[in-house]
Design a protein with these regions (language model features):
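Pocket-lining segment of extracytoplasmic ligand-binding domains
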Residues: 157-264
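Short, glycine-/small- and polar/acidic-enriched structural segments
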Residues: 12-151
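Secondary-structure end/capping motifs
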Residues: 232, 237-308
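Conserved C-terminal helix/tail region of periplasmic/extracytoplasmic solute-binding proteins
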Residues: 220, 307-328
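Short, solvent-exposed beta-strand edge segments and adjacent coil->beta transition regions
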Residues: 109, 226-230, 285-287
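Short helices/loops that flank or line small-molecule/ion binding pockets
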Residues: 41-60, 73, 122-123, 127-128, ...
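Residue-level preference for short coil/turn positions at secondary-structure junctions
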Residues: 7-9, 55, 89, 108, ...
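Immediate post-signal peptide segment of exported/extracytoplasmic ligand-binding proteins
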Residues: 2-12, 101-111, 308, 313-315
Length: 328
């Protein structure tokens, strides 16, 4: 694509420094027609909130569930099918070994910790537990210790806030919770996303000891490959410069292609690289597929799951949620 411009347009861009996007933020791969101003937010979760509440950036990496909810409530930005983080979700829900939790239905009538009800990890996992294992999510008390990014959400009555001054990690330790999501999604951290995380160890067993095997089988059955990070662009930017969608898509695709070479050669050895190399055994050579065609089933599944969990007030057409940069 060749963009004929007298001068490049300036865009404020907030993306995490990931192995497959770093070539963009380092300036090694340009975004055609764009003079980027990269704004580093640590953790990137803080940028989600700033984008949703203040629409602070022209381009931002954001959690897809947060985005879909915000869009349903009229957020003036739209997503591109550039999914920069992905993982499966049979693993990552940790249980106290003394709580008698042997299967998902055992969570009914009990308290489970998740940072916020709309956290993408929680949404995907609840969807799996409901659809595949018959969990009645309304019979679980979901305990949160953070705000929802999207303030308009009307939370179900079975979502409660942790007591003042108590973190999910504390509650898990003393038996106030029988289960909680690992890492930043729940019991592996404390503190506000606007002020930085304090990491906490969470040495508890997974609900599913054979999670990897279950994830492989679920993917082969459904074709759904959960995404965790997507790129959004202000509506106003695309209204004035529609070509920006393709410029961004091509830049991110080139950066990923460069990274894939190192991934398959074995040269890439970060924890993230190792995770995605393992995922290639399930999803194929490209563990981060971009584009609408390749991701349509997964996008539809997330929109459906968010609505069923009462996170969005209405159903939305995929064309209202995503711009296909390959059709611009």
């Amino acid at each position: 694509m060749v963009v004929a411009l007298a001068e490049k347009i300036k865009l404020d861009i907030a993306i995490a420094d990931l192995p497959h996007t770093a070539a963009i933020s380092r300036g090694e791969i340009p975004i055609e027609g764009v003079e980027p101003n990269f704004i580093k937010v640590v953790p990137q979760i803080g940028a989600f909130r700033r984008m949703v509440r203040q629409v602070e950036f022209d381009v931002c990496e954001i959690a897809p569930t947060t985005y879909i909810i915000a869009r349903a409530y009229g957020a003036p930005f739209v997503a591109l099918p550039i999914f920069v983080t992905r993982r499966f979700h049979h693993g990552g829900l940790l249980v106290r070994p003394d709580a008698g939790i042997k299967q998902p239905k055992d969570l009914e009538g009990r308290k489970v910790g998740v940072r916020a009800y709309s956290v993408t990890t929680g949404v995907w996992t609840r969807g799996i537990l409901i659809d595949e294992y018959g969990l009645d999510s309304s019979k679980v008390t979901w305990v949160v210790d953070d705000e929802e990014h999207v303030t308009q959400i009307q939370l179900p009555q079975n979502v409660v806030h942790a007591p003042e001054g108590r973190s999910l990690a504390d509650m898990m330790e003393d038996g106030g919770l029988v289960a909680g999501f690992e890492a930043n999604a729940g019991i592996g951290r404390s503190g506000s996303p606007t002020g930085g995380w304090k990491e906490r160890e969470a040495n508890y067993p997974d609900l599913f000891p054979n999670a990897a095997e279950l994830e492989d089988a679920w993917y082969r059955k459904t074709g759904i490959y959960p995404m965790h990070g997507t790129i959004v662009v202000k509506d106003a930017v695309l209204a004035k410069h529609p070509w920006v969608a393709r410029s961004l898509f091509e830049a991110f695709s080139r950066a990923k292609a460069k990274w894939l070479d190192t991934l398959h050669s074995g040269a890439a050895q970060t924890a993230s690289d190792k995770k995605y190399r393992a995922l290639t055994k399930i999803v194929g050579d490209d563990p981060l597929p971009y584009g609408m065609k390749q991701n349509l089933a997964t996008v539809k599944a997330l929109e459906d799951t968010a609505f069923k969990q009462k996170l969005t007030p209405k159903r939305m057409a995929i064309s209202d949620i995503f711009v296909d940069p390959e059709q611009v």
